[in-house]
Each structure stands twice: as structure tokens, then as C-alpha cells.
């Protein structure tokens, strides 16, 4: 990314992960992150995982990048989570909680981070695109759909019956 001069949108230490943000050619946000060891996460007794937003050291990240061989995504790499821009985060949260059985991990006004099990988030919904976010139209550039892989088939059967 440094060699290609890909503009970074931002970066943050979230307590459970460190992330760098950029945009693709369609203006979809992309988060590249590294999960910290679980024993460093702020996991509450009720299972909620509290996140923070603190500054990353840009110079430190730049120096690390200079030492690495060219990056190749490993075979079998999976997307860890998806962020969705929505008009109403509470309605979207309720939909995904009911339809996929996801649990609240962290919620603030206008955004929720939800997950299955003890992960910090598999899906996040936010209203940061604004209340007047236009509905997606056929043929529109951008994310049309995503696929959710369920590892526990019994869970899925129970959820759907």
C-alpha cells in the first residue's frame, strides 16, 4: 500500500484490535486489522466487549511496513467482519439479532457491533452515512450482497424453526 501510495482514511487502536482504514475504488470502506490476544480485550461479565478508539503510531506502522516482504493474502483467508451503512441502526441490529442470532457486543447511539460467540464483532451497523442514505438501486456501484458462513448447522436449523 505504501509503494502504491494508497491513501489511508485513518487508523485506530480499538482495545481488541488495531486497525487501518482505506477506501476501494467504489468508496467502500476497508478495514485491515490485527486482533490483539483475547486476554487483552475488555470483556464484561455479560459478554459485551467494550471498544476504544485511540491513536495508532503512523511512524511505527510505516517502519514495520518497510521491513516486510511484499504482501500476499494467504489462501483460506476469510473476511472477519462487515460494516453496513444503514438508515436506522437499532432496526438493523434487531433484524440481524433475530435472523442470525447475533449478540450485542458494543452499542453507541447510531451504531452497534454484533457477533456470534465470544468474538468482538462479525457485523457492525451504523448511521454514519446519514439519515437520508439513499436505497441501493439495481446496477449501482458498491456492495450488492455478502455471504454468511454458518459453521454450526444445528444452530442454523434451530434458528430457522
Annotate the PLM regions:
Residues 37-90, 143-146:
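N-terminal beta-strand motif that seeds the catalytic metal site of vicinal oxygen chelate
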Residues 14, 81, 120-122, 145:
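Histidine-centered active-site/metal-ligand motif
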Residues 8-11, 101-106:
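Short secondary-structure junctions
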Residues 98-99, 123, 158-161:
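Long compositionally biased, domain-poor regions of proteins
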Residues 29-36, 103-140:
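Conserved short beta-strand elements that form part of the metal-binding/catalytic scaffold
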Residues 1-29, 86-90, 128, 144-161:
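Vicinal oxygen chelate
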Residues 88-104:
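Amphipathic alpha-helical segments
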Residues 16, 78, 108, 142:
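Exposed loop/turn and edge beta-strand positions of beta-sandwich/beta-sheet ligand-binding modules
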